[in-house]
Amino acid sequence: MYGKIIFVLLLSGIVSISASSTTGVAMHTSTSSSVTKSYISSQTNGITLINWWAMARVIFEVMLVVVGMIILISYCIR
């Protein structure tokens, strides 16, 4: 019984991670076309500030999903 619950939870985490990654990329492509040339010229090692914040957001969401899964699994096992 717990095996099925854990499998479904892991599957839902993968779906939410892939959905958040897709929206982060879509947000990046839509905002990158509207930035000015002076902003693009202020790159650090080839990564613009927009890429940096999008990447940090995705990492934060992945960490949040992992911690939430651990807490939910430990709550279900009790």
Swiss-Prot record:
<comment type="function">
    <text>This protein is a minor sialoglycoprotein in human erythrocyte membranes.</text>
</comment>
<comment type="similarity">
    <text>Belongs to the glycophorin-A family.</text>
</comment>
<dbReference type="InterPro" id="IPR001195">
    <property type="entry name" value="Glycophorin"/>
</dbReference>
<feature type="transmembrane region" description="Helical">
    <location>
        <begin position="53"/>
        <end position="73"/>
    </location>
</feature>
<feature type="topological domain" description="Cytoplasmic">
    <location>
        <begin position="74"/>
        <end position="78"/>
    </location>
</feature>
<keyword id="KW-0325">Glycoprotein</keyword>
<keyword id="KW-0732">Signal</keyword>
<keyword id="KW-0472">Membrane</keyword>
<protein>
    <recommendedName>
        <fullName>Glycophorin-E</fullName>
    </recommendedName>
</protein>
<keyword id="KW-0812">Transmembrane</keyword>
<keyword id="KW-0730">Sialic acid</keyword>
<feature type="signal peptide">
    <location>
        <begin position="1"/>
        <end position="19"/>
    </location>
</feature>
<dbReference type="GO" id="GO:0005886">
    <property type="term" value="C:plasma membrane"/>
</dbReference>
<keyword id="KW-1133">Transmembrane helix</keyword>
<feature type="topological domain" description="Extracellular">
    <location>
        <begin position="20"/>
        <end position="52"/>
    </location>
</feature>
